[in-house]
């Protein structure tokens, strides 16, 4: 809890705002509106900022992921700003939760304060060449490998070739396995289907998509049509 603050200015947003105020980065009306929205979050005591999650995401990306050509990934400042918006804002809700007695017989309802992530959707309205696909890759890869629950993710685009621009850097990162996590996840052989599961590769690119076999999580490509996405 000591890292949470309902008054702190987010690190990467603060750097961006200072550059805008100095006149180094011109912004349009839409970006100005988003900056006003973030300033309102900073002022509102109901919303809390935690600096730790985005730093973990940055370390994961820069130690594990690669570009499509296999070169090391170094996150752009814009990525850090976008990631901070996704991972660092929280609010609390009070819920009545059933708590059993220590003996296992009976129980009672208690009111607990539950921490919830504020940002569940993010829209990036930026021009061509802003590396949106690579940012998408970094979010997908982080959630599939760091989240220990079973997840099912979908990436979609107007054409399958465009959708593959998200998957391709991820597959390259798995092939290179430059960081300690991917080295561990790619130990063993994908062809070892008869021996113990511990001897198999745990993070694999298959015909389904990219699978994390430790958590049974999947990232797949789907065509951009209503019937396929539903």
Listing of model-derived features with the role each one plays in the protein:
Residues 1-230:
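Phosphate/NTP-binding elements of NTP-utilizing enzymes
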């Amino acid at each position: 809890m000591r890292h949470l603050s309902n008054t702190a200015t987010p690190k990467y947003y603060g750097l961006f705002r200072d550059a805008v105020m100095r006149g180094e980065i011109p912004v349009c009306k839409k970006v100005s509106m988003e900056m006003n929205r973030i300033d309102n979050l900073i002022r509102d005591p109901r919303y809390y900022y935690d600096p730790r999650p985005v730093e973990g995401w940055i370390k994961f990306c820069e130690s594990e992921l690669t570009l499509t050509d296999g070169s090391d990934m170094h996150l752009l400042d814009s990525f850090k700003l976008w990631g901070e918006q996704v991972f660092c804002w929280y609010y609390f809700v009070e819920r009545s939760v059933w708590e059993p007695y220590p003996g296992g017989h009976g129980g009672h309802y208690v009111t607990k304060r539950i921490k919830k992530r504020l940002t569940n959707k993010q829209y990036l309205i930026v021009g061509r060449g802003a590396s949106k696909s690579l940012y998408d890759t970094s979010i997908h890869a982080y959630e599939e490998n760091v989240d220990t629950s079973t997840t099912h993710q979908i990436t979609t685009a107007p054409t399958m070739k465009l959708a593959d621009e998200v998957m391709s850097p991820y597959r390259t990162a798995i092939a290179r396995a430059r960081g300690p996590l991917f080295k561990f996840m790619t130990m063993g052989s994908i062809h070892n289907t008869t021996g113990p599961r511990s001897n198999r590769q745990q993070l694999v690119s298959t015909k389904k998509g990219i699978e994390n076999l430790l958590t049974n999580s999947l990232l797949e490509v789907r065509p951009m049509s209503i019937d396929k996405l539903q």
